[in-house]
Amino acid sequence: MSYPNNKENSNNIGGGSFSVPSKQPQRVLQQQNTNINNHQTTSTVKSTITKPTTTGATTSTNTSTIPPTTTASSSSSSSSSSSSSSSSSSSSSSSSSQSVPKKKWCIDDFDIGKLLGMGRFGHVYLAREKKSQFIVALKVLFKNQLQTHNIEHQLRREIEIQSHLRHPNILRLFGYFYDDKRVFLIIEFAKGGECFKELQKVGSFNEQTAATYTLQIADALRYCHSKHVIHRDIKPENLLIGVGGEIKIADFGWSVHAPNTKRSTFCGTLEYLPPEVIEKKGYDQTADVWSLGILIFEFLVGRSPFTSDEEKNIFHNIQENDVYYPSSISPEAKDLISRLLVSDPHQRITLKDVINHPWIKKHAHPKSLEPTKLGLPLPSQMTY
């Protein structure tokens, strides 16, 4: 569930409310790089929230995936006094490297602000962690809805995957907790709101905006694929815009970690599905590459290339793969899209080649991969 900018006032879910400042607090807090496979990234996103070490009564029994800032306790005094100095050093090093227990969160740790958006299974609120004053979005999911639609396993997978991803163009999932009726996800606040809402406002994006977003998404997907993660639902509704105008891939509800095997699950959004998915032939990471081609087309035209009022016609259009390119699409953009929308998944352009494509090189913002230096206005605020 993504969230738009919503001006409605919220019904407080945890007591207290506040107004978001014009800028994110200039606060850099400690974090640990507990990435998948312990991979070190070059992400410039340094701000995170950290649980204070003080204890108190909570109504939650679950633990957060947010790395604590406390360090492990010093080596035990029960070590043998007869050990050699090298042995003592080794013991101390081993003890100090022990993992610190994860901290527990509850709703009382947050000031709850306005309602940002509503989805099928819950709501998203602006929130502020009381100790650090860090601004986040709090996604509140209702257990009865999750159980009714049998998607508890999907939520667990989403948490497991998204909480381990570290990339400036992937929305951070800092942690989670729950009570008797609700599950709370602590996620990064993307001030620009939904990409889809911006696309609706302006009809279509100019080439600089489209190329910049495409470059950022391609780089983020390349990172995901290096971790054997397939998103499986890339579309404007699942993209958010950060404070610097950068795109953020969100909603990993359909994502899967698939190191060695092809997938066969029919999932995602119909107009974005590649032929191998609808024909149930099995698919891999190249399914995301096809979806990127659909996305670029929609960025530039305002609709997907295979859209239809009839579901059966969408199936037919995807299988035929006969794309009509309006004259407004430049030759370079058409070339890139046509290289992505190839029916044979093995013949599609790679994400590395997308990043280095002439259309990207010509139109993408020079600071596209440096979000802290980007400063790109929202499409609806641009002067054309």
UniProtKB/Swiss-Prot annotation:
CDD domains: STKc_Aurora. ATP binds at residues 116-124, 139. The active site is at residue 233. Residues 1-12, 19-29 have a biased composition (Polar residues). Coiled coil: none annotated. One of its GO terms (biological process) is centrosome localization. It is an enzyme of class 2 (transferase). It comes from Dictyostelium discoideum. This is Aurora kinase. Its EC number is 2.7.11.1.
